[in-house]
Structures are given as structure tokens and as C-alpha cells.
Amino acid sequence: MVPVIALVGRPNVGKSTMFNRLTKTRDAIVGDLSGLTRDRQYGDATWQGRSFILIDTGGITGDEVGMDEKMAEQSLMAIEEADYVLFLVDARAGMTAADQMIAEHLRKRNKSAILVANKIDNIDPDVARAEFSPMGMGNAIPVAGSQGRGINALMEAVLGHLPRDAEDEALDQEVAEGEEAVRIPGPSEKDGIKIAIIGRPNVGKSTLVNRMLGEERVVVYDEPGTTRDSIYIPFERDGEKYTFIDTAGVRKRGKIHEEVEKFSVVKTLQAIKDANVVIFVMDAREGVVDHDLNLLGFALEAGRAIVIALNKWDGMEPGERAYVKTELERRLFFVDFADIHFISALHGTGVGNLYKSVQAAFKSAVTRWPTSRLTQILEDAVSEHQPPLVNGRRIKLRYAHLGGANPPLIVIHGNQTESIPKSYSRYLENTYRRVLKLVGTPIRIEYKGGENPFEGKKNTLTDRQVNKKRRLMSHHKKAEKKRRDKR
């Protein structure tokens, strides 16, 4: 399971700055979900190949009233959701009563935490550590979040405390043995294709899970984890193995009440990261709302294959259906590669077709193509539409190879690749998608420059070359002297 890290502390100690730096600001952020995650933002972050979910919270002072009280409650909830806590304090302001209160709360909850002394600009780190030592949280790690100072040391400490899964250990073993570390995930014999059913509350996720499992389902086990873990439900259909990653909690047939289904952002984000394919469920009667876009954006940034299911399609008038389809085209243009199904989970209409799209999306996400195939597609694309000129020189793209899967990562080598415009990258992405007939999965393209490895370096001559150079110079001097003497 993907670990969850919460940033907590008083207001204005630099939590949001730290959040933006660790998520690199370009990663998907799922936050500001009204009534559920006010002043909690969720981001997908990766450090040294290790992925985790980061939670940014509002400040805690201990004397909140009104809206501030609600914000503080959300921060305390984030602590409960997290596997690990980064407790930020302000090195300039020194230790406060609010800092001590938060430290006491973390001790009571028995939470694993690291004390982070932020804003150490022009402050002696040893002085900062001594200032906060009375709180009993161990030695503070000094950082300057706005400048990035100390972040590497902080993350080294954090990663040392986070659990490692089998995939991380296998990757480390490959690196230790000198193998190329490219993850190409596939369905294990035990799990099959892992499918996450995600969506807002009350869109019919529970009903869809049970409808897809069916009356004749083969469930090996229902194994609930901790209160933060999802439920993994292995089953078979037509000889194919699947595993549902269900975020709606334990349920029994006939006892599902959609109106009380609990929604957990953390469960959903963890399910997305752990899945091969995401089935994104929407309520056709409500159309596309901002919450849908937030969650769908996170699935896209995580690189997961996506299938969209528009539930509660039955009973809608033709005019309503036409309007919803228009809205889908307008607002979901960024996932136009995903299959869309119009279903009724309650009555089973169209549900069976989801499996075909799941298999197609998974196949597209994990298929391995040889370098020769990817390079030929690149050459054909460049021949049809050349890259632009940069300072009078044409960008050259030489060859391409597969760098990873789920999502497919195509690595393209060439020169001046840092100057390739986004429009040309989209052209290449669309070309690969069309030629390889990819459906249901995003594609990522990464460029590698072809810098001259000898640029700026002097050649070191061998002894033989030095002697030869001396002989040539001596011969040249003698010949020059003879020409002068003849004159």
C-alpha cells in the first residue's frame, strides 16, 4: 500500500511551501473537496523512486473558533489518516505553546513523526535544534523549505522509516546487479488485473462492485486491512483473474445503503496508485462536476489506465442524455483516450461491457514494443512533420525505446530536445497512440539530449603521440630553416 505522509504544524510555518516542493507543484492535487477535505490537500509525490501520498493541512493553534475550529479538526483528521507525520515548526519564532500542544497530541496518538525546524535562513542549525529539544520529539531536522536547503537530508530520514514493498526491493536488487531498472508490471497469478472502482459518494460504486462480481462469482477471500486500507477482492470471470480494490468498505449483499457510503480521499488515492486499471464511476444525472475532474486528474497523473462508467443512465430523457454527452466531450477532453460506458449498475445494463474495456486498457498499458518498432514510428512521424528550427538549427530526433509501462513511457533521444514545444510532443504522443492502437491509457514521452561527451575536455596524448608530435615539429622547423637559407 502506498504510504501517506501528513504535514502538520501551526499556521504559517511553511507547510504549503514544503507540500509544493515535494509534489513539485506540477503533480496532481486533489483538494478542497467541500465538506470533506476543507483545508486538506492531497498530492502525489515521488522521491528517489519511492512514491507516497502527501497531505497538506491547515494550521493548529489550540484556540480556534468558528471556521478555524473546523480547519483544525481537518488537520487532526489528517494525522489519523497518515502513516507518518512531518511536524513543522518555525525556527525564527522559536517554540510556542501551540507547538507543545501538537507534540503532546502526536505522543497521545502514538504517531511516528519527525520534527522539522523550517525557516533556518541565517540561523545556526544547532541553535534551532536546542530550541525545540524540550518538546521531546527528538532532534529537529533543519530545513529552509523556500530554498530547498536540507530537503534531501529530511527525505532520507523519512524514507528510512517508511515500509518498503516487494516491488521496491526487487527494483533495488536489479540496480545492485547492474540491470536496467525498468518496471514492466503485469498481472500476477494470484491477483490478475487489479481494478480500482473510484468516484464520489453516492454515484453507485458499491452497487457496481457487487453487480460486476455477480451471483456466480468466485471470491477467494475478502481480506479487510486496517481502517485506512482498502478491501482486496479476488475473483474470476470467463477464466480471467481480477482483483477489485474496493474503497467503499466491507458490505454484504442486500445491506448496501449508498446514502451512507463513506468516502475517504486517502483510500481512493491509495487504490489508484495500487491498481492497474481505474474504473471511474460518475452519476449521469449530475453530469460532470469539479470533484470528478479532481479525482480523474489524480488518476491521470498517476498514469493509470482509465475506463469511465456513467451510472444511472436508465430513466433519463433523450434530451438529458444528449446534454450529458456534450458535457463529457467538452470537459473530459484531457482523457479522450478512455472508453466511456453508459450503464445502470442497479439493473446491470451495459455492465458486462466494462470487462472488455478493462482488458483492452490493461493490454495497452503494459505491452512491450521493441526499440526498432518505436524508432520506426518516430522516423515516420518526423518524415511527415519535422520538428521546428531552434536558432536556425533543426531539432534532430534519432531513436526511441520503451522506458516503462503502466503508463507506457517512450524515451526519445536526440539533440536540442529541451527546446521541443508541447505541441510537437502532443503530435508524437497522438502518432504513437494511433499507430500502436492504444486505448484507455495515458502515454508519457521523455526526451534525452545527445550532448557531446567530449565537449569542454582536452585530449590527453599518449607517449607515442607526444613523440610523434615532437618529430613532426622538428621536421617542420628544419624545413622552414632550409627555405629561409635558400632565400
Curated annotation (Swiss-Prot):
Residues 467-487 have a biased composition (Basic residues). NCBIfam families: GTPase_EngA (TIGR03594), small_GTP (TIGR00231). Keywords: GTP-binding, Nucleotide-binding, Repeat, Ribosome biogenesis. Associates with the 50S ribosomal subunit. GO terms for molecular function: GTP binding; ribosome binding. SUPFAM superfamilies: P-loop containing nucleoside triphosphate hydrolases. Pfam families: KH_dom-like (PF14714), MMR_HSR1 (PF01926). Residues 367-451 form the KH-like domain. GTP 2 binds at residues 199-206, 246-250, 311-314. InterPro entries: G_ENGA, GTP-bd, GTPase_Der, KH_dom-like, KH_dom-like_a/b, P-loop_NTPase, Small_GTP-bd. GTP 1 binds at residues 9-16, 56-60, 118-121. GTPase that plays an essential role in the late steps of ribosome biogenesis. GO terms for biological process: ribosome biogenesis. Residues 3-166, 193-366 form the EngA-type G domain. This is GTPase Der. Belongs to the TRAFAC class TrmE-Era-EngA-EngB-Septin-like GTPase superfamily. EngA (Der) GTPase family. PANTHER family: GTPASE DER. Residues 449-487 are annotated as: Disordered.
